Amino acid sequence: MSVLSIVSFLLITGFIALFSALKTRKKKVQTTNGLFFADHNNNFFIVGGALLLSNISANQFIGENESIYTNNMSVMAWGVSSVLAMLLVAEFFLPIYFRTGAMTIPDYLGKRYDNSTKRLVSIVFLCSYVVNLLPAVLYGGAVALTGMFNFIAPLQLSYWQNIWIMVWVIGLTGCAYSVLGGLRAISISDTILSIGLLTIGIAFPYFGFKFLGNGDWFKGFHILLSQHTEHLNAIGGPKDEIPLSTIFTGMFIMNLYYWGMEQFIVQQALSAKSLSHSQKGMGLACLGKLLCPFIINIPGLVGVHLYSNLENTAEVFPLVVKDTLPGVMIGLTAAVVLGAAISTFNAGLNSSSTLFVLNLYKPWLEKRNKEITEKHLVYTGRKFEIIVSALAMFSAPFIMFSKAGFYTYLQQLGGMFCVPIFTIILVGFVSKKVPPQAAKIGMIFFIFSYIIFNYILDIKLHYLHMLALLFVFTTICMLVVARFYPKYKYTEIKIESVELSPWKNRYWYFALLLMGMVSIFVLFSKWGIA
């Protein structure tokens, strides 16, 4: 732990916080629109950076590099194949959300089905954030920072105690940032962190390969390409962690849900000043996802050659960073990892507050004819963020005892919440006659079936394939239920809150992105460098 790395870490982190504070100081957050949607005033560059950094947390740095170290590059499919889903979201989903004036995903479901469906989905979202998203983000950040710095080594605490302390440091910092600054402050810091992430992506291959080759960059690069090449393969076989076939089943569904229906992601897209800026922002985030294998995953590949048998494989990323990078770059990497963790944590907190205040608390006040003021709603939202933060910080350290790998644990648990929501939204998009009863029964059917087949019964089927099968069965279930309840025709109500003209030249850019997606899979295969 060098003084230079700590000083650079503190200076970079302080600069980002100060810059965000200066940019937002003249705009006090006094309305729910300002707290949750940055007053719909973000341009495409801010939207793209916010989308990318809300997606990239310490979970990816820790989880994906662990998977590459223990298995191979097949885990990159989560990010690279998501480009197709993101483009579909930009083309079809975003226009619907902007056109209907929906501020939350449950808000749209309330318009499409009914208010009880809106409440049910809001509760499922909140459970997902409190149980899965927020604790996992804190744990991933704690593992990364503990491995890189181990600030509290002089206290001679155990690894478990270190994790507890770092979880609370990240959680308290993130909570304060979200409560005081709102979505605008989060979006600005994300944009700066995107630049830092790109810098790391350029610098790490240089320093990592140079260290691997004992000072000779080309020798290190040759070692990476000629030894343990099985780890370079992104085309997963049946026994790999991510088989290739899952890209076309459960993974595609989860990616489409994540980028088009996950509240804390969609909320970033809806903060744009127009539909065109939102679509451009999504396209910019796609470019970032294509660069991620070169930015995020190189440490795992280098770690394969440096460490033959790690006891805690989740530590491979921080160990590689600590051993290969110079002090200033360690500080920058730590600042970006901390910033990414705080960014995703903040986005989840902000969305949790949005869901609670707009979909549960405000309707409860209206039902009782109580006075509602923007000031009171903002105050309630901030209090709720503090409560959710505390719950996440108390539960995060226990992820260490998960039997599955960290990233697999994260995706398995996430599937239980996201795919049923995806199903009822997709059916709502496609069919205008499916009633609210079908949506509620479909959600309950999916969640209980997934718990039984994935956690209670020992079904020898990859969880992503199981998610795809349950998606099909739940869709059939909803259509069957629809036959026994009175049908009604849903009529979309159009609310033009921002400029709705789409991005004119998007198809050329979309085509280039899809070509890039295929090229990266070919590169990391037996036809390429694997």
Give the ranges of each region predicted by the language model.
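Membrane-embedded helix-loop-helix hairpins and adjacent transmembrane boundary segments
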Residues: 1-530
